[in-house]
Regions:
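A general structural signal marking secondary-structure boundaries and capping sites
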Residues: 72-75, 109-117, 155, 219, ...
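A conserved alpha-helical element in kinase catalytic cores
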Residues: 46-87, 91-114
């Protein structure tokens, strides 16, 4: 499916519909990121981030809107959700190239997981099947198909502890405000196993083990039990990441996603 980046006209139509009394609405810039489709805009002196679901999902933007409504008011607040467009308040701060130290990251995730649940469960198998079906046929390997069949037969691990998850924790989704960290981009959020969140964070193996130790202490979970549960989720999270890169390559034609996918496959094959 050809990828079509949202145009300024589409954005202006959304703003006119959502903010009819606005005296001025100007597109400041298209925000960088692998997902595309995000714009920083100013409406009557209020800075917002507007994002359109370019894949025309009927559920994703409303879910993100509801997720942000349930989260603490210190996070980005949802303003409008119309026809696949979502506008949230802009969080000022710095985006850094690396994740925070393990104690800070563990505290951030534990605090999130203490919040009330969203009300909808994360189901990985439909996402894995979608990525396979919407990827380039030439990129569908026997290894991918075998792993997909194996996970489908096994089924998802039984949750160790259910909580609201972000599911996309990486440096680009963390805003640093002095001594405070804020998560942004909640489009993949939902309720799931806390061990799944730890398996999905973009970390090397050594740092992930340190995070497991830190989190187990905070959450009063047996460290060995948590480590084993994260290990059960690792093939799922690895395939989710590799499949996402493959699908994004098919949508955009950007070979950056091939490089990222190849590295994700390498990691899956060496585990």
């Amino acid at each position: 499916v050809p990828f079509s980046k949202p145009s300024n006209q589409n954005l202006e139509g959304f703003l006119a519909q959502s903010f009819p009394a606005a005296s001025a609405a100007g597109v400041v810039c298209a925000l960088p990121g692998l997902s595309d489709g995000a714009w920083q805009v100013v409406v009557d002196d209020e800075t917002l981030v507007a994002r359109r679901d370019v894949r025309k999902s009927r559920a994703r933007s409303p879910r993100q809107y509801r997720a942000l409504k349930r989260l603490p008011a210190t996070l980005a607040r949802p303003r409008y959700c119309v026809n696949g467009w979502l506008a949230v308040t802009f969080l000022p701060g710095e985006i850094q190239d690396a994740l925070p130290p393990v104690p800070q990251l563990g505290a951030l995730l534990y605090h999130l997981h203490q919040q009330p649940r969203f009300g909808w469960r994360i189901e990985l198998l439909p996402l894995l099947l979608r990525d396979w079906q919407q990827s380039a046929p030439s990129r569908r390997t026997r290894f991918w198909l075998r792993l997909l069949h194996r996970l489908r037969r096994a089924g998802e691990p039984r949750p160790l502890r259910l909580a609201p998850l972000h599911m996309d924790v990486h440096p680009g989704n963390l805003v640093w405000q002095q001594d405070k960290l804020m998560l942004i981009d909640w489009e993949y959020a939902g309720d799931g196993d806390v061990a799944l969140e730890l398996a999905c964070v973009w970390l090397d193996d050594e740092t992930r083990q340190a995070l497991i130790i830190d989190y187990a202490h905070r959450a009063a979970i047996d460290e060995t039990q948590l480590r084993r549960q994260v290990a059960r989720w690792m093939p799922w999270s690895g395939l989710l990441m590799a499949g996402w890169y493959e699908r994004r390559f098919q949508e955009t034609g950007d070979r950056t996603f091939i490089t990222l996918a190849d590295e994700a496959w390498r990691q899956l094959q060496t585990r």
